[in-house]
Amino acid sequence: MSIIDNRKAFFDYHIEERYEAGLVLEGWEVKALRAGRGQIKEGYVVVKNAEIFLIGTHISPLPEASTHIKPDPVRTRKLLLHRDEIKKLIGKVEQRGYTLVPLNFHYKGGRVKCEIGLAKGKKLHDKRETEKKRDWEREKARIMRSAT
């Protein structure tokens, strides 16, 4: 079950491979995600010291968040992957044009997971082509509905 989707990633990038990573979260972040108070549209993934981090995602704290901590909604969060997956991703990201983008947050076995995608950026004409295809599919569905 998906908590948050990054639909903009599919518009801006060609997703070539997908990986499921664990997230290192604090308790208030999990509660906020369960309440649907997260946003990953501005997020991106970086590699530092053979570790992978999620930067720029926004998780708004609930108003009932604890009084003795100051929640940081856009803090850097560590992603958990197997060592061989990290090495493979590092090799691919160092190639020209590849980047890592968060695709969605979802639950798996009661834990919050982040699906990341190995992606290549789309050019402007590719984005226009995608938009034309989407419009045509919508128009085709409208015609089919009116014909029946």
Swiss-Prot record:
Residues 126-142 have a biased composition (Basic and acidic residues). GO terms for biological process: trans-translation. This is SsrA-binding protein. The keyword RNA-binding applies. GO terms for molecular function: RNA binding. Required for rescue of stalled ribosomes mediated by trans-translation. Binds to transfer-messenger RNA (tmRNA), required for stable association of tmRNA with ribosomes. tmRNA and SmpB together mimic tRNA shape, replacing the anticodon stem-loop with SmpB. tmRNA is encoded by the ssrA gene; the 2 termini fold to resemble tRNA(Ala) and it encodes a 'tag peptide', a short internal open reading frame. During trans-translation Ala-aminoacylated tmRNA acts like a tRNA, entering the A-site of stalled ribosomes, displacing the stalled mRNA. One of its GO terms (cellular component) is cytosol. PANTHER family: SSRA-BINDING PROTEIN, TMRNA-BINDING COMPONENT OF TRANS-TRANSLATION TAGGING COMPLEX. It is found in: Cytoplasm. Keywords: Cytoplasm, RNA-binding. It comes from the Bacteria. NCBIfam families: PRK05422.1, smpB. SUPFAM superfamilies: Small protein B (SmpB). HAMAP family: SmpB. Residues 123-148 are annotated as: Disordered. Coiled coil: none annotated. The keyword Manganese does not apply. Belongs to the SmpB family.
